[in-house]
A protein has these predicted regions:
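Long, polar/charge-rich, low-hydrophobicity segments
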Residues: 333-339, 505-534, 541-722
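Inward-facing hydrophobic residues that define packing positions of alpha-helical scaffold repeats
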Residues: 305, 324, 328, 474, ...
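Extended hydrophobic/aromatic segments used for targeting, binding, or gating
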Residues: 85-89, 97, 270-299, 472-547
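Conserved positions within tetratricopeptide repeat
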Residues: 318-325, 387, 490-493, 497, ...
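Catalytic-loop motifs flanking and including active-site residues across diverse enzymes
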Residues: 297-301, 466-467, 532-535, 616-619
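Replace the tail clause
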Residues: 2-469, 473, 479, 574-582, ...
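Hydrophobic, structured segments
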Residues: 243, 247, 436, 482-486, ...
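Inter-helical turn/loop segments and adjacent helix faces that build the functional surface
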Residues: 308-319, 477-489, 543-550, 627-637
Length: 753
């Protein structure tokens, strides 16, 4: 019998499914920065599908915090804001709070930093943003003081709105003006996409900008930007840049040579312990740093100071040599060199002043009162000389107007203002005696610091690309010292080799042919970005040239093939349905920073400009040219030229912003001299071979020469290069030069140093 639906028994009313309450997921990350928030009252989420889907389902703004463990203001934000009960409660109730380690996701850091810099005129860390559930930026900034906190980020900063007020305002705006927020966020994203057109405006024509005059025109803005009062600094706080024009022209050296003394003599350098350079100075005279030390910065500085030393004289004396050895020792020793061979990421800005202290302070490990300084040195006369040398003053050497938060009252940051010869005249003693006193004082201060103080906390993440930077710097340094200091050379080359072996074993998936980004006890899930491939390939090529180890260039070749496959812009333009839509004219060569299927990434960028890091495209161009020569692979050379073409429009308009790519322009236009060293199987290399090594390792890297080392007929370089195979089969051990595709024995003028 048919039954009317109204006759059915009443159905139970099912309540809409409630989303589970937020819980802090920081313990699911292996990042030291994120793990630092495990006990935070904020219910931190990781940037994954779960967090993004929750934001969409609950229609909430995402609060995105991007930072890193060594960062001073990241720690203050965690204390002043994230630990504040009302701030934490509001974050959990009205937003989906997401935390990201910038060193694990540099792609996100770059995208959202571009936004904050465009809107606010400046950036920094922590990077704090409010995003739509589609990850489009609505509002952002850097450090915001917590409720009741009065911390300033600089002497001229005025007290502004605190973090709690910002949270309340953003909650209200989203509740009352969501359509407007979404529309403005889409407009902002459109503008960011236009900005991201870098590297998509070039043509596939012959490289028109390969006129060498471009390199000289690029030095004029560099020269005008260098302050004569504070060399190396511009109009604002000083930032260490390693991509100045050392690789381009000797002329540029005159513009930047004045930078070296104030940087290595300033407050950024650890004068007592030789433990690297702090990341940047908050004053234009390089006197007051933020004390975090990043592996990437110090690796790049090692390469820069190595070039400066080689250009100046290459002798085993002088401050430049001391800086080179200090930095190389810093990397090839604990704690930066970790068990197993990888290099740690950073040392924190904040530390305990003495063992047993309960609160950390910025720079505490590196600061000295005059009273403690004198007591440690002991001898009054020697203490006076050392204090004069390092500018250690009775009431501290940080001016009150440069210390808005009173962190450095009566404290001294060692820095050198006078030459030792000048101090010798002041005290009526010889320069040699001054040097002896300084060395003695340094040893006493270092020993005291090691006993009484706690070294800043280490971020022991091993980053594949940053390890590539260190491998490159140590390989070049070890090679340069091969004749001058064999023991140091072996130490540095050994550390570089061990790191390369570690990265291959732990971060390279041989089956997938994929490089991963981070190792910390175990391999992380994040795959490497284009910059990681570029930096690691460069390090391996440098290590091959320094050691002749075939597995280095073989691994570099594997990585290069994968980088091209994953990141090179060789496909047709993607459609608007793609997760990462691109401008219609985007398919014109060069490397994207991310893969096409990168998740939770609103833009796919190509970087050509050098920043605090060398651009991945500039390094990749150099790698392609070098591998193209060593492995006789024309495809690599063609892709290098095509990558240069992709940035043609920008380079022609602003050449001084692209020093790394300009080096590629020079290589493309002039080529380079290639040296072939065929080793004697008996190990009895002749004098010419020795002179080739001395010449090439004793020169600053200029991108205009290549070195191929042959140990036997089965070498990869021989198998890939028929002409080289013929030379090995018919020639004798020794040194050769390639000219117009032909080999000839090195003449005297080829190896003159």
């Amino acid at each position: 019998m048919a039954t009317n639906s109204t006759d059915l028994p009443p159905q139970p009313v099912v309540a809409p499914e409630l989303a589970p309450s937020l819980r802090n997921r920081a313990d699911q990350s292996n990042s030291p920065y994120i793990q630092g928030q495990i006990n935070s009252p904020v219910a931190w989420q990781l940037l994954d599908d779960e967090a993004v889907e929750r934001a969409k389902r609950e229609n909430k703004l995402i609060f995105l915090n991007i930072g890193f463990k060594a960062c001073h203001y990241c720690r203050l934000t965690a204390i002043d804001s994230f630990s504040h009960p009302e701030c934490a409660s509001l974050l959990n109730e009205a937003f989906v709070p997401v935390i990201v380690d910038r060193e694990e996701r540099p792609d996100l850091d770059t995208i959202y930093m571009n936004y904050v810099q465009a809107v606010n005129g400046a950036g920094g860390w922590p990077l704090n943003l409010f995003l739509t559930p589609e990850l489009e930026p609505v509002f952002g900034g850097t450090y915001w003081p917590g409720p009741g906190a009065h911390t300033k980020t600089g002497p001229e900063e005025e007290e502004g709105v605190d973090f709690l007020a910002i949270l309340k305002n953003l909650r209200k705006v989203w509740q009352e003006q969501e359509p407007r927020c979404r529309q403005e966020a889409k407009e902002v994203l459109s503008k960011l996409r236009e900005f991201a057109a870098e590297g998509t405006l070039g043509t596939r024509s012959t490289v028109q900008m390969s006129k060498i005059g471009l390199t000289s025109s690029s030095t004029a803005p560099v020269a005008s930007a260098v302050s004569t009062e504070n060399p190396g600094a511009g109009k604002t706080a000083a930032d260490v840049s390693s991509e100045l024009d050392l690789d381009q022209l000797e002329e540029a050296y005159s513009h930047i040579a004045g930078t070296f003394d104030p940087v290595y003599g300033g407050g950024l350098r650890d004068h007592v312990g030789g433990c690297g350079f702090a990341r940047y100075s908050i004053t234009p005279d390089w006197s007051i740093p933020h004390f975090e030390k990043l592996t990437s910065d110090n690796a790049l500085l090692l390469g820069l100071y190595l070039d400066a030393w080689l250009i100046s004289n290459g002798d085993k004396d002088g401050e430049l040599y001391d800086v080179v050895v200090e930095l190389a020792d810093y990397f090839s020793s604990p704690p930066m060199r970790l068990p197993g061979g990888g290099f740690a990421s950073s040392e924190a800005a904040d530390s305990y002043y003495r063992r047993g202290d309960t609160d950390v302070r910025e720079g505490a490990f590196h600061l000295w009162t005059r009273k403690e300084f004198d007591a440690v040195i002991g001898d009054e006369h020697e203490a006076t000389i050392a204090a004069t040398y390092w500018n250690i003053l009775e009431h501290g050497n940080v001016e009150p107007d440069q210390d808005p938060n009173d962190e450095f009252m009566n404290q001294n940051i060692p820095r050198v203002l006078k030459e030792q010869s000048e101090i010798g005249k002041q005290f009526g003693i010889s320069g040699e005696e001054v040097a002896r006193v300084i060395a003695s004082a340094k040893a006493k201060l270092k020993a005291h610091r090691g006993r009484e103080r706690v070294r800043p906390e280490l971020d022991d993440k091993i980053i594949s690309g940053w390890n590539g930077l260190v491998i490159s710097a140590l390989a070049r340094t070890g090679a340069a010292l091969a004749v001058k200091d064999a023991a140091k050379s072996a130490q540095y080359l050994g550390a570089a080799i061990q790191s390369a072996e570690f990265v291959r074993a732990q971060l390279w998936d041989e089956k997938e042919k994929t490089l991963y980004k981070v190792f910390r006890g175990t391999r992380g899930s994040t795959k490497a970005f284009a910059e990681d491939y570029a930096y690691l390939i460069e390090g391996l090529i440098d290590l091959y040239e320094a050691t002749g180890e075939e597995n280095c260039i073989a691994f570099a070749d594997e990585l290069q093939q994968t980088q091209i496959k994953l990141f090179y812009d060789a496909s047709a333009p993607t459609t608007s349905a793609s997760p990462n839509p691109l401008p219609a004219h985007s398919s014109c060569g060069a490397f994207f920073a991310t893969t096409e299927d990168a998740k939770h990434t609103i833009l796919r960028l190509k970087d050509g400009m050098d920043t605090a890091f060398p651009s991945n495209n500039a390094v990749s161009v150099s790698n392609l040219f070098r591998l193209g020569v060593a492995l006789a692979t024309e495809t690599y050379t063609a892709l290098a030229r095509e990558t240069l073409n992709a940035f043609e429009a920008e380079i022609l308009q602003y050449p001084w912003l692209f020093p790394g790519l300009l080096s590629g322009v020079v290589s493309s236009r002039l080529g380079g001299r290639t040296y072939i060293v065929v080793r004697d199987p008996s190990g009895a290399d002749d004098e010419t071979v020795r002179k080739v090594f001395i010449k090439l390792y004793g020169e600053a890297r200029g991108g205009l020469r290549n070195l191929i080392i042959v140990k036997g007929p089965d070498d990869l370089v021989v198998r890939r290069n028929p002409a080289l195979a013929e030379l090995v089969a018919t020639g004798k051990p020794g040194a050769y030069v390639v000219e117009e595709g032909k080999f000839r024995p090195c003449a005297k003028e080829d190896v003159e140093y």
